[in-house]
């Protein structure tokens, strides 16, 4: 009996639109067979409800990421004398700038080197997250995961340890340094050749603390917003470190015609589909 293919839909929500891709894995390749986008016109709970009703799944489930205010921090800890609630209680004000209880937290643990432990913490603005969850509940849609911005970008890439991702934001370049799917450093720097080069060198020094000698690749978004000179400077920096490649992908049908690979939200949706298919950490 032929085993049925697992199908999953990754969704990315920004302030401008919602995009999604539907995919399955075949011959060690993620095959994207459908894609859809919808312009935002209402609060996130109303828009996600409208989107899910418009894009009713025949099979599979959703995994979702939304551009909600998110802060991340990684800190060492001693597992032999450790209580998660106490750790957060006494350190949260040092790690995050949210006021009071207006955020929701999640955390995971990593080890490097042996017997040296790190706690990766994510804080997300609570109100928008609760609106998103309410919109999902209203549809009774099958949702496996709600992930945190911009972590899913890593899931669409071949290298997720030692990769730097960046987004042009209001005249600055926002950079994230990734190790084992967690962000170990982020920074915002002016978009000049000197500043970005120095910033990446500092990220590389931080990366070496986690056993990776050099940057493994760079992926930048929003370069079309820059002047020609700025863009050429950024492209020159990418050429030094190399551009991080995608996981093996094949686009068919509406997936080929509609999905704009290389745009941040589409790549996020691809990453969420990969996570939903558990097509991460399989040697890529």
Task: Label every PLM stretch briefly.
Residues 2-3, 7-22, 31-37, 58, ...:
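Small-residue (GG/TT-enriched) beta-loop-alpha framework at ligand/catalytic clefts
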Residues 27-52, 191-193:
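Nucleic-acid-processing active sites and adjacent nucleic-acid-binding tracks
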Residues 44-49, 85-88, 196-205:
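Well-ordered, non-membrane alpha-helical segments in soluble/globular domains
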Residues 45-54, 148, 159-160:
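Phosphate-interacting basic helix/loop segments used at nucleotide- and nucleic-acid interfaces
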Residues 56-70, 212-226:
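Short glycine-rich phosphate-binding loop at a beta-alpha junction
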Residues 68-119:
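Internal amphipathic helical hairpin motif
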Residues 215-243:
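Glycine-rich phosphate-binding loops at beta-strand->alpha-helix junctions
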Residues 245-284:
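Glycine-rich phosphate-binding/hydrolytic loop that grips phosphoryl groups
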């Amino acid at each position: 009996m032929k085993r049925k293919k697992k199908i999953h839909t990754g969704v990315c929500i920004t302030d401008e639109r919602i995009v999604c891709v539907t995919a399955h894995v075949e011959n060690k390749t993620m095959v994207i067979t459908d894609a859809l986008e919808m312009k935002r016109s209402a609060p996130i709970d109303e828009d996600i409800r409208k989107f899910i009703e418009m894009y009713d799944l025949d099979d599979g489930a959703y995994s979702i990421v939304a551009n909600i205010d998110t802060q991340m921090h990684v800190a060492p800890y001693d597992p032999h004398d450790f209580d998660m609630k106490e750790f957060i209680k006494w350190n949260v004000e040092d790690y995050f700038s949210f006021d009071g209880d207006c955020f929701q937290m999640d955390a995971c643990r990593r080890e490097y080197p042996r017997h040296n432990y790190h706690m990766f913490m994510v804080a997300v603005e609570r109100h928008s997250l609760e609106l998103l969850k309410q919109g999902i509940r209203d549809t009774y849609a099958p949702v496996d995961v709600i992930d945190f911005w911009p972590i899913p970008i890593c899931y669409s890439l071949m290298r997720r340890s030692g990769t730097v991702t960046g987004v042009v934001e209001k005249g600055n370049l926002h950079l994230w340094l990734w190790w084992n799917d967690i962000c170990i450093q982020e920074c915002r720097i002016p978009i000049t050749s000197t500043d970005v080069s120095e910033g990446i060198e500092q990220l590389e020094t931080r990366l070496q603390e986690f056993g990776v000698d050099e940057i493994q690749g760079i992926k930048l978004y929003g370069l079309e917003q820059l002047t020609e000179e700025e863009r050429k400077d950024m492209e020159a920096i990418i050429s030094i470190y190399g551009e991080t490649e995608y996981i093996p992908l094949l686009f068919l049908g509406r997936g080929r015609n509609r999905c704009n690979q290389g745009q941040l939200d589409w790549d996020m949706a691809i990453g969420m589909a990969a996570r939903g298919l558990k097509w991460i950490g399989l040697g890529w």
